[in-house]
């Protein structure tokens, strides 16, 4: 576990000259033990429920290193995030509306990132392909101008970052090479509406080896592709390098053990 965490940290230090923060995707294994371990390795954590938020905090992950995901957050969960100064990743219009109303009721500022679908197709199972235009997660890229304008008129919401995740169990590098350029283009778009984007979260998705035929890239190769793509796009547009975030999950925990099942019954088909 620690070796995998350190491989991400080492690769970011090697290939990305700007600030960075790897964020553990806790759905891969949410526990106080894992929260404590990744916190000790300097990672942040992404959570999708109040239970995962509480687990992260109890495990010692600093509030400012936690991001709160989800496309159907409850009011109770949003209130918890606001009260604990946890960054929220806004997924849709309903999300933003509830966040605005609740932050206004508390008279409390909140930092957010916007998740959008970059329109990148990748070769993985359709159920875990999340970067295409018809994904249930995130704002369509064509709606971002309207969204940035709406956010600029809110009282307590501060847009500090962008998030995109193209899918899981991905063996290709080209989609993530494309993602860096697209995300930097969106930084420029947000800037036109007065938003200072200081964080780019490229999600996760690095595949792991389930079968002998599987041949996923290494952590080093994946981080190199993502990092150089963002650096090149920022240099081209004379932008300061943002804080680069990524969200590894299964690539951290997958090699730490195996699950053994006892067969209970058979069905002839």
Q: Where in this protein do the model-derived segments appear?
A:
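A non-catalytic, amphipathic alpha-helix used as a structural packing/dimerization or gating element
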Residues: 3-7, 146, 182, 225
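Active-site-proximal beta-alpha core segment in soluble small-molecule metabolic enzymes
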Residues: 18-199, 208, 264
């Amino acid at each position: 576990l620690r070796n995998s965490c350190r491989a991400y940290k080492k690769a970011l230090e090697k290939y990305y000259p700007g600030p960075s923060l790897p964020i553990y995707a806790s759905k891969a294994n949410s526990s106080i033990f894992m929260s404590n371990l990744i916190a000790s390795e300097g990672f942040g954590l992404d959570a999708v429920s109040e239970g995962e938020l509480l687990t992260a905090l109890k495990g010692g992950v600093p509030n400012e290193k936690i991001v709160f995901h989800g496309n159907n957050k409850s009011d109770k969960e949003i209130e918890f995030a606001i009260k604990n100064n946890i960054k929220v990743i806004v997924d849709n219009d309903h999300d933003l509306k509830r966040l605005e109303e609740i932050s206004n009721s508390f008279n409390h500022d909140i930092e957010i990132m916007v998740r959008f679908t970059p329109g990148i197709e990748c070769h993985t199972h359709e159920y875990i392909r999340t970067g295409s235009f018809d994904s249930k997660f995130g704002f369509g890229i064509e709606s971002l101008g309207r969204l940035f304008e709406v956010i600029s008129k809110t009282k307590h919401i501060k847009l500090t970052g962008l998030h995109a995740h193209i899918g899981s169990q991905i063996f290709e590098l080209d989609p993530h090479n494309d993602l860096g350029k697209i995300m930097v283009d969106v930084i420029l778009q947000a800037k036109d509406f007065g938003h200072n984007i200081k964080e780019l979260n490229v999600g996760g998705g690095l595949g792991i080896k389930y079968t002998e035929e599987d041949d996923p890239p290494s952590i080093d190769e994946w981080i190199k592709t993502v990092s150089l793509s963002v650096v090149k796009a920022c240099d081209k547009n004379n932008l300061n390098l943002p804080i680069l975030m990524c969200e590894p999950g299964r690539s951290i925990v997958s090699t730490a053990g195996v699950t053994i099942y006892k067969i209970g019954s058979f069905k002839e088909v």
